[in-house]
């Protein structure tokens, strides 16, 4: 009620790709900027969005700064991620992936905008646990019958994920936050593939 230009739409969640395309169908403007509820556009990006002359044949990507609570995460693979978020809905859309959805860019150019999106993705340890369960289930559901898995594969995917995040991507430089993130990556990847293993077994019955 305080923001008459805002239209709140509620509906079923059918995976990230489908849900974002469904939400875009309600937009009255052709240009779609995807900003999640835990993300904030900084002043530089806001100015860029106001002044930029957009080209419908270009999909625009944004730079992301990640935070845990109010602590900026500068390593772990979270720092300065470039993610496609601005597009013309008459030209393209998101793919239908349940998780790891992305804007389709066939024959389109990609350009990065100035400024940043500040992503306050987690505020408690419990949120890591909840998201690990949710994302691993979506991954397993989306890949059941398409990808193979086994307990051994799940184990080594988890171990490598920790090593990659904490050592190769220097998560140790983020202090205890880096350890939390690396362990969360390990758990998420283990559950992704062990759930996929169970889903595939169910399909064979």
Q: What are these model-predicted stretches?
A:
Residues 1-10, 14, 42, 46-52:
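Acidic donor-binding segment of Leloir-type glycosyltransferases
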Residues 11, 35-37:
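Catalytic metal- and UDP-sugar-binding loop of GT-A-like glycosyltransferases, i.e.
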